[in-house]
Amino acid sequence: MNEIYLLVGGEATRLQPLSSGVPKALLTIRGERIIDKIIKQFSNFDNFNFNLICSIKHEELWIDYKTNHNNNVNLLFEKSKLDTAGYIVENLNSMPDKFYCMNGDLLLNVDLPNFINASSLCSNSLIGSFEVEDPTRFGVLEVGQDDKVVQFVEKPKDKSYGNKISLGLYHLHKKDILEIRKNLEIPCSFERQVFPMMSKARLLSTYTVNGDMLDVGTLESYISAHIVKGEDNWISPNNVEISKSAIIKNSVILDNCIVEDNVTITNSIISSNSIISKDTIISQEIIRKS
């Protein structure tokens, strides 16, 4: 049985008020929670125990999720902000010898079975990567000929360091983290502390997947995640009333909403239980009205 630790403590601050007080992983895409999409994707390929590293301020929401939606997850709560790697480093002695770790608020469109197979063949920790056209917008993994990560370069000026960036999915060996642990202080980040130290010690390899990932933490990406090719909008099938005179373009309408006469909605998200009054014009906004 594989162990996977999903980092689900973050909130989508740029999606407020839709996301106010809610971890990003519990937001829905086309009616399905992001965390459920991730769990389903991994469960299709292998046997996993799902361990969710949560913020204590979301304790009530996560207990409700486990009780009413998915009893087959283990909830692990951070009592304070530990950054992306802090909980794992702090509790390293109780971790298995090898385990997967992933940012629990990403949508992956990748050859996941190949990554899992590559991780089983790799003798040290492995970070998933994918290629982008413009690496100057990202933190780049400079990779050697042996697929070892040489260094992390933040927003390089050109492609001289390559064009591979982190997928947010890792297979970690406890022995590798133990080698660098004395140099780590908690809170600590995988991206800023753990992985750069591991790469200097030649303890980190990469596997480049086919495909990409989507972080749905912005207005544009949240809308994009909902609308598939051939569609103009995504409108929830759950108790939504829209006037025939309303105009809606490239937008998302969530559950239990009413859109009245002569409303125009463009490039926007209408949160659940909202009422949009007649003659309202909405553009590039996230709305929660009643």
Language-model regions, residue ranges each:
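Conserved N-terminal catalytic core of the sugar/cofactor nucleotidyltransferase
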Residues: 2-7, 14, 27-28, 32-114, ...
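Short alpha-helical oligomerization interface
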Residues: 20-25
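A structural signal for short hydrophobic beta-strand segments in well-ordered beta-sheet cores
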Residues: 26, 141-143, 195, 206
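Short, well-ordered beta-strand micro-motif
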Residues: 28, 49, 129, 142, ...
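Short internal beta-strands
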Residues: 51-55, 129, 269
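Catalytic-core segments of class I nucleotidyltransferases/pyrophosphorylases
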Residues: 100, 107, 113-120, 133-135, ...
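Short beta-strand-to-loop element that shapes/binds the nucleotide-sugar donor at the catalytic cleft/hinge
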Residues: 126-143
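Structural signal for interior beta-strand "rungs" in well-ordered beta-sheet cores
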Residues: 234-290
